[in-house]
């Protein structure tokens, strides 16, 4: 039914676009800058002294069978990915150089996409966004100045698809293991009246998930309308998605995996009135997010151009969760009135978010100088609130029982100036200066119960930050095929909402500061390229993952005074023939905390005990990552065999050997064949085998510990959970372009 609806809508739009296109002969000479730039010129080029990788739409298309964007980038240098459901669809995330997603800046057309409070990007709210992208650039390290939260390990710069000259339509469908499927319809009007274009996409993605009950149901859209003339490009872009995802964030201990299997999922589990294990059907996350962008690119002269944008994002949703034997006082109930202190219950947590702003940049390019200056201002307003629709000891509550509500507000203003100057032939200097001001407030009552005051946690946070982030470097291109560069960057970043609300100490978390040194060399000719990038990232007050999760499955972090990440990224590509390419890259790194002191709590909350471990590995930061890909293209057939090896990762910063993610090596095989049928531009069929050699592995987890007192002696304990990933699984696809 859904596929029929998609095809019907596509045929209507495609037919209409043909009618209008006939009336306006396409004259490409009257349309300038159709491949418009984003509102902020934050892209790195071969003259920018930073480490970066570009991934084209063609590369994305070959592997885009429904997995989220992080999984489409997993073979780029220093990248590892995670998946709650175990197969790359649903709640997924990405780490670069060991840095988690809350410290990776993500933009679309230069507009910030990270959540203003959590700093993460929930890809589940942007399903199939890869189908509407022109390309993606990943900058590793501090990178160039950009909008939104600071880049502390990397930035991901996405550029949405260009408008086309000719009417077109496309239909893609995929199906595979775990009932995973994706249906996508894309249409383009072509050029209307020599000035206008309209492009649209709708997608549906679903899966039962590898992990038990980890089902995902996703819908999304993309729509852009553009106006073009000789000196002006004006685009309105909107995209959004709705998701319904069953919780799978509890993961499983090794003991649970042994007893119940690797797919065991405790989320929603309870004991019914007959003493049987049951699962709550509505243990789902339900969220809708809609993004709107209005982007203007204006050429003022042959050397000067102006970019401006307005943007707005609306998000709202909720999730329900069955909780067993909960203390009723934690939910605002009077135990005396109810007649019991504890009861099973269902809690419903809701969010209503608004994020918007504007940005402006001026670009100058003439002779030896390429310079940009710009500014941006963004504001966020978000309500967090929750209620308990059902309590076992009472039944359905006759009235709405809200037990917490708080509001977060954030204003973020930044200004920057950047210039690349050619000093002599082949040698250029790069300077990038940014000032950023942030005001962040949270007011109200949180969902954490504070036993020190015997009441819900009160929030009255008002924090201000002023950051100056300078960057400078040299880039030297010599002897035709050689390039060398060096850069030094300073980056600073404010804490996230969870750093304030989940901390076990009274004082505010500290802002982080990064000093990033990068030195690289590349050789690139027609058939062979090789390169190396050395980096040293020294942090002051880095907020490192502790290994623990808060009550809603989000990773917790804490400041450490001194830490660093250093390493070398190696990469090579060999093209000995038109039909064969061998690509490989590796990251060898050392990620350490200086003089780490672990704080262990009685019952994980009171009476802290400190243990000094000296210098330790930073959690979730592998020392070695290796990627290899063999790519064959012959006539209309293509094949790629890609392999990733990730070394052992500690899940806490204390280096306990019983709290690690073991090393793993996973290979994926992709096959594709292109041909034509009558009335089509092209047809492509594809088939993928993921985890070809059936590796049993986990790519994420949590860990923690505490102590209790027995007979006057402290007894320490530790625990851990693991995100099991799917064994060998399959996906097939077909694509029609008209």
What are these regions (language model features)?
Residues 112-140, 159-160, 256:
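Short acidic/polar hinge/loop motifs at secondary-structure boundaries
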Residues 582, 592, 647-651, 673-738:
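C-terminal beta-signal and adjacent terminal beta-strands/loops
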Residues 22-62, 101, 533:
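Short, acidic, small-residue-rich periplasmic hinge/interaction motif at the N-terminus
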Residues 425, 536-538, 558-653, 737:
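Gram-negative outer-membrane beta-barrel transporters
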Residues 299, 305-311, 475-477, 483-489, ...:
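Membrane-embedded beta-barrel scaffold of Gram-negative outer-membrane proteins
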Residues 287-449, 475-477, 481, 487, ...:
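Face-selective signature of the C-terminal outer-membrane beta-barrel domain
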Residues 70-112, 128, 134:
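Extracytoplasmic beta-strand/coil segments of soluble accessory domains associated
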Residues 168, 175-206, 211-248, 292-303, ...:
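Transmembrane beta-barrel wall of Gram-negative outer-membrane proteins
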């Amino acid at each position: 039914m859904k596929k029929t609806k998609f095809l019907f809508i596509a045929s209507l739009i495609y037919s209409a676009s043909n009618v209008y296109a006939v009336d306006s002969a396409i004259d490409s000479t009257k349309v300038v800058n159709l491949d418009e730039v984003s509102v902020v010129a934050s892209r790195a080029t071969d003259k920018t002294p930073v480490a970066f990788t570009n991934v084209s739409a063609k590369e994305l298309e070959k592997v885009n069978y429904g997995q989220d964007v992080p999984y489409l980038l997993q073979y780029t240098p220093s990248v590892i990915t995670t998946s709650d459901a175990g197969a790359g669809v649903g709640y997924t995330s990405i780490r670069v150089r060991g840095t988690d997603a809350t410290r990776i800046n993500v933009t679309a057309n230069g507009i910030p996409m990270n959540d203003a409070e959590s700093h993460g990007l929930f890809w589940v709210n942007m399903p199939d966004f890869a189908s509407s992208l022109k390309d993606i650039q990943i900058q590793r390290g501090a990178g160039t100045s950009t909008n939104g939260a600071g880049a502390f390990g990397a930035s991901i710069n996405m550029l949405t698809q260009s408008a086309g000259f000719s009417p077109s339509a496309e239909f893609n469908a995929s199906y595979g293991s775990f009932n995973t499927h994706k249906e996508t319809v894309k249409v383009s009007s072509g050029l209307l009246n020599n000035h206008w274009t309209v492009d649209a996409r709708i997608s549906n993605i679903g899966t039962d998930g590898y992990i038990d009950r980890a089902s995902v149901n996703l819908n999304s859209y993309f729509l852009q309308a553009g106006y073009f003339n000789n000196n002006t490009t004006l685009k309105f872009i909107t995209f959004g998605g709705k998701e319904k995802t069953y919780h799978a964030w509890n993961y499983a201990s090794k003991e649970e995996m042994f007893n119940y299997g690797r797919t065991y999922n405790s989320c929603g589990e309870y004991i019914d009135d007959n003493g049987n294990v049951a699962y709550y059907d509505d243990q789902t996350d339900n969220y809708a997010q809609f993004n709107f962008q209005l982007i203007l690119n204006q050429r003022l002269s042959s050397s000067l151009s102006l970019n401006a944008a307005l943007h707005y994002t609306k998000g709202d949703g909720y999730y329900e969760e069955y909780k067993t034997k909960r203390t009723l006082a934690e939910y605002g109930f009077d135990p005396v009135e109810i007649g019991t202190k504890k009861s099973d219950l269902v809690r419903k947590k809701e969010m209503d978010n608004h994020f918007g702003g504007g940005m402006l940049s001026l670009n100058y390019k003439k002779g030896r100088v390429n310079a940009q200056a710009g500014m941006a201002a963004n504001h966020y307003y978000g309500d967090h609130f929750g209620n308990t629709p059902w309590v076992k000891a009472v039944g359905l509550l006759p009235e709405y029982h809200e037990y917490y509500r708080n509001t977060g507000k954030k204003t973020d203003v930044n200004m920057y100036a950047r210039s690349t100057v050619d000093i002599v032939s082949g040698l250029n200097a790069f300077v990038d200066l940014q000032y950023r001001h942030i005001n962040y407030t949270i007011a109200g009552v949180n969902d954490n119960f504070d036993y020190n005051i015997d009441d819900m946690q009160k929030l009255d946070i008002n924090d201000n930050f002023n950051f100056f982030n300078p960057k400078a470097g040299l880039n030297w291109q010599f002897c035709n095929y050689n390039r060398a560069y060096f850069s030094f960057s300073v980056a600073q970043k404010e804490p996230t909402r969870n750093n304030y609300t989940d901390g076990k100490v009274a004082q505010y978390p500290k802002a982080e500061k990064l000093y990033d040194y990068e030195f690289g060399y590349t050789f690139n000719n027609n058939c062979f390229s090789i390169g190396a990038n050395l980096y040293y990232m020294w942090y002051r007050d880095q907020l490192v993952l502790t290994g623990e999760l808060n009550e809603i499955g989000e990773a917790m972090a804490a400041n450490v005074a001194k830490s660093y990440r250093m390493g070398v990224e190696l990469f090579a590509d060999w093209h000995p023939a038109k039909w064969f390419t061998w690509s490989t890259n590796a990251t060898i790194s050392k990620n350490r905390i200086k003089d780490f002191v672990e704080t262990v709590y009685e019952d994980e909350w009171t009476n802290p005990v400190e243990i000094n471990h000296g210098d330790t590995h930073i959690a979730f930061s592998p020392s070695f990552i290796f990627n290899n890909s063999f790519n064959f293209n012959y006539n209309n057939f293509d094949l790629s065999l890609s392999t990733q090896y990730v070394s052992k990762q500690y899940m806490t910063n204390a280096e306990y050997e019983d709290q690690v993610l073991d090393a793993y090596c996973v290979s994926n095989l992709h096959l594709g064949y292109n041909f034509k049928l009558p009335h089509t531009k092209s047809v492509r069929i594809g088939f993928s085998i993921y985890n070809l050699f059936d590796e049993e592995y986990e790519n994420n987890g949590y860990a923690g510990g505490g102590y209790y007192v027995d007979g006057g002696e402290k007894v320490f304990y530790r625990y851990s959970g693991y995100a099991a990933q799917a064994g060998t699984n399959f996906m097939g696809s077909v694509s029609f372009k008209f």
